[in-house]
Amino acid sequence: DLKVLNTQVQNYVTNILEPMLTMSYHLGNDYPHEAVDEIWKLLFENAAHDSIGSCIFDTANEDVYMRYKQVRDIAVNLVELHSRLIATKIKNETTNEITLTLFNTLPQKRKETIVFETYLPADNFAIKDAYGNLVKYTVIEKTDLTDYVLSQTIRLNPSKKIYLPSVVYHAKIAIEANE
């Protein structure tokens, strides 16, 4: 349904993408003005007629859907890129730890359970907050992908040693996030 898609895409752009880009910009990364302008242009093109009310022909309906898909694809890719750019700017004092970064794109503090998927290089691990305190977590499900992942490893520079874990798990984890 185009109404649902319209709401989902606009909420993603205003509540996730734009705050993420603003955080990234404040850390010294470029703000992608042209891409954001293109996103809003595509959204306004869809709002220019009765497409959301389903009062159009099938071909126009397909065009509207494709514009929403374009917006979603651009927005998701920008969030992915800028979340990585932000995460690389966060200092990790210990060199032997893997960093997990959660983002709050809303203007108020939050306390809620966050469920995410990640890859784990060990069976036992700890999650710590920014202050070094242990964070309680629950592993909802875990799949051993060691053979698959390690057989897919590509070395861009064979002269450099790369980190290869002894095991690799794909896991769904729930944590209680505060702030």
Q: How would you label these PLM feature ranges?
A:
Residues 1-179:
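Carbohydrate-active enzymes and regulators
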